[in-house]
Structures are given as C-alpha cells and as structure tokens.
Amino acid sequence: MAKLDIIITHYREAWEVGKPNFDILALQRGISFDDIRVLLVNDGIENAFPEEYFDEYPYRVEQINIPHGGISAARNAGMDHATAEWINFCDFDDTYISIYAMRDIMNILPAPDYDVLWTQMVMQDYTEGKEVVRFAPERVTWVFTHAKYYRLEWLRTNGIRFNTEMDFQEDSEFNAVVLALLEDHHRIGQIKTVCPVYAWCRREMSVTTRPGVDDEANWMHFLRNLHVCELYREKLGPERIRDMVVRTVYDTFLMINSTKGITTAMKDRIADRFRSFMDEFDEYYGRPDEDTIRQMEDVSKYELMSRPVPVSYEIVTAWKNIITGRLTKGA
C-alpha cells in the first residue's frame, strides 16, 4: 500500500498541460515509487485519458471518472478512493518543482505526531501574458489545500469533506474546517526544505469549474472562518491571529463580492457581521499587518479579474478600511 495518495483533479485540459507534473514525479530521486500513487480524478467521464498515457511511469496511476460536478466533487471522489495513510491535493496544471521534492516529503512520513503537514510553495502566474513566479509566505498559504498533506483517517473520522455547494473558496473552507476540528494546533507541522517544492499555477481558466453558487453555503463558510479565529485566539499570538483573519475572511469577502449569484443582502449581511466581529476583538487583534493585506490582494487578484461581476474599487477600499480599523463602529 502506498504511503501517499496524490489526488490530481482534471476537467477539460489537454494532456500537455498536466504531463510535466507526471513527468517530474517519474524523475524523483531517493524514494520508492511503491510509496506513492496518483489518483487522477476526471471531472466528467468523457474527459478521461487513454490508459496507455500512464504505462511508462514507474509509479501507479489510477483514473477515477465521475460525472461533472466541480472541483469539490472531484476532490471528494479522490478521498473516497484513497487508501494511503496520507493524501495530497494537486491541480492538473500544478507541478512539483524539483526531482528531490518527494524525497523531502516521504522522509517525514508517516509522522505519527501530526495530522496535517505543509511545505513551502510558489505561485506561478500566467495571467499577465508572461510567466511571473512569486514566493507564497506561510501567512497566505492556508487559503490553499495545495502543498498540504492530510492524514486520511483523521479527515474521515472528523467527517471533513469539500463543500459541493461552493464553486469557489473551497480550499479556504476546507482548511477552516480542518483548523476548527484540530483542537491541538501542535498537530500541524512544517516539512522544512531548502527551497519550495510545489508550484501552484494560475491561468485564465481554472482546472475544474461548476456554474452557480449557493448563498447560504458562502454565509456558513464566512461564519466558520470567524469561528476558527475565535477558537485559536487563546492558542496563537495576536500577530498570527491577525494574519488568519486577513487571509481567510478578507479573501472570502473579496471573492463573494466578485461572484455572480451572491445577493446584495448577503453582501451587506457579511459586511455587518464582520464589522461587529472586528469591533469586538479590536483591542486584542490591533491593526493587521499591511504586508499581509497586500499579499492577500495579490492572491485574490486573478479571482477578482476572472469573475463575471467585477469588484468595484469602492467595495475593495471600504472593506480594506474595515479590516484595518479605519472605520468606526456603525460606519
């Protein structure tokens, strides 16, 4: 049995888009290929690849074909088929960076003292007509499931799955649940490497998408983020808590306000609730780090530009003012 199942989700991308990652996994040094398995989940039965594409790889590849249901449904299907002790979620257009990436990870496993592990990652942006690579600091990585490693049995015991009613922010929602249920934050550990091992790719088209959003699902996600902040208020220092507020709630608000289907009433409801939240904890949290806010804006940039309803400058500015404490109560 493999020690790590890598769950890769695929929608309609050509084989050439994902092939580099399959190739670099085949070049890994210092590991046993029996210890890893790739579960390729095709979101749409018609999107499966010929099996001979995978014949030459030294590790096992299993295709899982499901009716089109979106990224959350695809990842859930991967978890349902996984049997390894640990799992990792990987987009079809992402890549592991070096031929020693898996060695650094596999040397740590099975890591019995941890339920969640994470590694450094970079953001590879192709949306500006050229490749731009940016380092992703720790404080912003928790809006991603990428470059994270989850103990499968712990996820199943706690009933943690992706919310299929959300067609965006499913990563942040998933990790919010993970953090909320992981009562001992010492069960989270970093796999320290010389350089980042994972590259998250940002392109004009997402890997897998589903039309429509659920208003209440996003409201519940927002409340869950607040709950995580409250839960960890006594466990982490003020600086880490401020970072958590910014990277989850601020990112959520921006995406909600840029997505067709979220009602004006829901936008107002979220803004009012978060304003009261910040008022309540203002003395404890203090002023969020400006650099963190800029990083979250960078993470959100592509999503803001690609959504069917653009976010106005006024909305972004007003929300940033709320988060940095420039607005008084009731403003």
Segments the model singles out, each with a brief description of its role:
Residues 1-223, 234-235, 327-331:
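Nucleotide-sugar donor-binding/catalytic module of glycosyltransferases
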Residues 3, 46, 56, 72-73, ...:
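Membrane-interface aromatic/basic loop that binds lipid-linked glycans or pyrophosphate carriers
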Residues 94, 166-179, 249-252, 301-314:
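A broadly tuned preference for mixed-charge, low-complexity surface segments
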Residues 166, 236-243, 285-296:
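Short, surface-exposed acidic
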Residues 196-203, 209-243, 247-257, 261-281:
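Catalytic core of nucleotide-sugar-dependent glycosyltransferases
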